[in-house]
Amino acid sequence: MKKISFIFLLLICSFISFIGQSYAADDEVAGGVTQTTREDLQADSTFTIRSGGTLEADLNNIVRGYIAAGNEIDNATVIVESGGVIKGKSNAIMGRELSGLIVVNSGTIEATSSKAIQLQDAQGATITNKSGGIIFAKTNAIVQQEASGGEDATGTTINNAGTIYGVDNRAIYFYGGATNATVTNESGGILYNESTEATVQIDTNSTLVNSGTIDNRNSPSNAGIAIVGNDNTITLKDKSILVGTIDAGSTTGNTLKFQHGMGQGYYYKTSGDFTLQDLDGNQVVKGSAGSVGQGASETLDELLSYKSINLRNFFNEYKKLDNQDAWGETYVSNLKRDAHTNNLALEYDLTNFGVNLINKIDNANFVIAFEGGRQDFVKDHKIDYQNISAGIYLPQKDNPYFNLDLFILGGITLKDGERTILTNTTTSGKLTIDSDYETYEIHTGIKKNNLSSIPDFGLAASYSMTPSYDESKYFSWTDRDVGNLSVFFEDDYNLINSKDSKLFLGWTLDIRKMMGDKKQVYSIVTQELVPYS
């Protein structure tokens, strides 16, 4: 009986001891408290800096998960709440050789010397810097490398919605065989440095996604992103900003992806070899990565069609006026064109104002048309234009055999384009470029008028030629020829025909086929580049 009681008492004491140890493994610095001694992490534990709490001392490894080889701590968690501070000398958080380290920062993690977070030979670390969080060091802020003869340095994940920066070196620095890293800079996240070194450097088989800002504040001629290993993927998304070149050196198997949205122009200075992909379907070219977002041939085809229909409607209205020698009309229109991803048709709003004038001369009618307007594309791109066209209109309503209408007009459109592109060559990550060019147009058509219930029908053709021109920066365009051929059916019905008023109801069916150049050929700097099909 005494033996059983002794065993029972021993089990109770062991359980109490286990509970005490488990509870004691978690630690914190409370709000309003400043701790000036080093904090040694415990395995499977959480160390928390509460809001208003501070851990600060002129010490290396002020938060320590590694003391010596074989004496590292695994699966530890460090949480810094908003308003909390960790401030040390070098390696503010020492995560060397740790497995499963988690750091969640909403406050400040600072190293007055080198490395705010040291991840040498670490596996599976996760660093989350939340909005408002700051991680910085005088040299490199977050570092991982695989030391010679050390453990694998692999599987690190960094998610940044706050600010991470290095003053004299880099914000994020992976090298020496660090593999399988994932770096995600979210919208609102900022990664920057103030030196000639790369802002972010990744090594091998890693992924970098930027939806925020990566900024080399020393100069855009320095590297914003550097790659020192093979088989990496970089994705630049949304309205992300990159300042500094993309440098792949002599590495291989790297992919550079863009997802800025359909119609967004960009120009990124790169060095090294990349496979380029635009995930929105924009044309992208090799060399220094560029995409035009300038408006495809289909856009010109549509504008030609709108002009042709406008002229045909004008002639129909003129025919309804009996024995009118001279006549004119003004018009204002607004068109909203939705995007179409499959054929890269861009979304735009078209607002224009025009005047059509006609004057009878012997057996023909002289026509002159003026038009001005703005084509406002998505992604900060607009084109202002002014057009003048002139020609003849030949109605043959008195011809008993054919009763045909014919017209032909030619004109010129002066265009002033302005668009904002994303680029890593300026300190803002953006650049406004402009262009002045002209387009020459011809519109012609023939219509068979039917007096019975059979609808009128006809053929119309339009053609435009845009000579070669240069934008103010980076892009040079070769000449482009675009035309279309339309088969149309139309009719109108006179519902009211009194001395004082008339009311017509009409309809038009227009079937159009585009012809001419379907690809845009352009040059970046001095190297001619042809877009992918």
Each predicted region: which residue ranges?
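Extended, low-hydrophobicity acidic Ser/Pro/Thr-rich
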Residues: 477-483
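Short secondary-structure junction motifs
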Residues: 195, 454, 500-502
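Long, low-complexity, polar and repeat-rich extracellular regions
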Residues: 1-371, 383, 390
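Basic side chains
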Residues: 2-3, 448, 480, 512-513
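Intrinsically disordered, low-complexity segments enriched in Gly and acidic/Ser/Thr residues
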Residues: 495-532
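A general structural signal for well-ordered alpha-helical packing
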Residues: 443, 484-490, 504-509
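Outer membrane beta-barrel translocator domains of Type V secretion systems
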Residues: 299-477, 488, 493-497, 517, ...
